[in-house]
């Protein structure tokens, strides 16, 4: 600055690490991460079922292109891993939505959406894929928010003295709101 050397300075509060930990503690489950769609690096993972059969990989790539064009952060897993491995992998990584398509789905002009938050599987017409995927991601986000809010409210207790706070903490744990 001003063509003169100056000592650099900055502050670091470790906030990014704390926020990541908060998301994991709030939304994680016994199967791994559960990421809210708005912060998930990958919102939807396209998984071709029996991808070596005619047309399946092409159909999966077409779904990927459509999801990306709709503004959804999506990727495809075209590896040779088994379907069960792929499903478990993206469940553990917290990808909010799995999009599966196989030969029978192509025949029926549909795909399967699987939600990470509750495991619900929905058969979706390919004609409404983008709208349904966006609505499902919004529903996942809203559901995670409401569940976290309810958990916070149920585990927050008011205390009017230090003794009361100690007693509440010993009996209930959770959060103490001092008044």
Feature names for model-found ranges:
Residues 1-179:
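NTP/phosphate- and nucleic-acid-binding module
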């Amino acid at each position: 600055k001003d063509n003169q050397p100056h000592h650099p300075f900055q502050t670091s509060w470790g906030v990014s690490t704390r926020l990541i930990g908060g998301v994991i503690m709030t939304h994680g489950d016994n199967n791994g991460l559960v990421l809210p769609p708005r912060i998930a690096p990958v919102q939807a993972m396209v998984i071709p079922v029996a991808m070596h059969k005619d047309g399946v990989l092409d159909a999966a790539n077409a779904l990927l292109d459509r999801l990306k064009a709709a503004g959804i952060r999506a990727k495809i897993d075209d590896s040779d891993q088994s379907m069960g491995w792929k499903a478990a992998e993206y469940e553990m990584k917290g990808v909010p939505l799995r999009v599966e398509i196989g030969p029978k789905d192509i025949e029926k002009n549909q795909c399967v959406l699987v939600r990470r938050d509750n495991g619900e599987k929905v058969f979706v017409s390919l004609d409404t894929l983008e709208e349904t995927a966006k609505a499902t991601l919004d529903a996942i986000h809203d559901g995670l928010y409401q569940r976290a809010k309810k958990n916070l409210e149920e585990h927050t207790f008011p205390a009017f003295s230090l003794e009361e706070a100690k007693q509440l903490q010993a009996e209930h744990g959770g959060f103490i709101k001092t008044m």
